[in-house]
Amino acid sequence: MRSQLSLMGKKEGMIHVFDKDGNLVACSVISVGSNVVTQIKVDSTDGYNAIQMGANEINVPEKTLEKRMNKPELGHLKKSGSRVFGLLKEVRLSEDAINEVSLGNEFGLEVLEDISSVDISGVSKGKGFQGVMKRFGFRGGPKTHGSGFHRHAGSIGMRSTPGRCFPGSKRPSHMGTVNVTVKNLEVVKIDLEKKVLLVKGAIPGPRGSVVVIRRSSRAKG
């Protein structure tokens, strides 16, 4: 069951650590608090087996909740134990695994103790509106005097046949702020006391952003 779970954490930044062979390794630091089961969905009533997990618990007065939440949200909150979370995520589980979970169960980094590699998903850094040279690495035009353009894409069309530009060509547009998954990152260290996970290499998003950690899909066994 543990191998199917995903955990929500926060990217804290990057540091360097020495591995067993004395090599200096760049690592991403992820803080992972308690992930609490707030809802259980089963195939007989919901059409599939899954659990909803909450993280980043928030202390909110009851009167404030009644003002800011509608009745369906308040009803869901009462069923889950009246605990408010800043993050909610649904995780699919098998039929056997769903029977091992109860409402209110808490999971942390101990889920990853026997795992050597993980997949990490997050939202990439937003770069705003960018041209084709930054966004796609286009060469651009001649840099010399007399050139009609320097940083444009160049020709993207043809002659009278077909007489149009094909859709899907690379154009200037918004760059970043997309869901990105980095696969098969090596787990360097798990500190259960400080609730910190170190993985080798970079992960998506800026410091302070939310990432989802799961067992690597490329892991053997």
UniProtKB/Swiss-Prot annotation:
Domain of life: Bacteria
GO cellular component terms attached to this protein's record: cytosolic large ribosomal subunit
GO MF annotations, alphabetized: rRNA binding; structural constituent of ribosome
Keywords from the named record: Ribonucleoprotein, Ribosomal protein, RNA-binding, rRNA-binding
A biological process term (GO) from this entry: translation
UniProt region (Disordered), positions on chain: 140-160
Role noted for this protein: One of the primary rRNA binding proteins, it binds directly near the 3'-end of the 23S rRNA, where it nucleates assembly of the 50S subunit.
Cited NCBIfam families: L3_bact (TIGR03625)
Family statement: Belongs to the universal ribosomal protein uL3 family.
Complexes and interactors: Part of the 50S ribosomal subunit. Forms a cluster with proteins L14 and L19.
Protein name: Large ribosomal subunit protein uL3
Organism: Chlamydia caviae (strain ATCC VR-813 / DSM 19441 / 03DC25 / GPIC)
Organism classification: Bacteria, Pseudomonadati, Chlamydiota, Chlamydiia, Chlamydiales
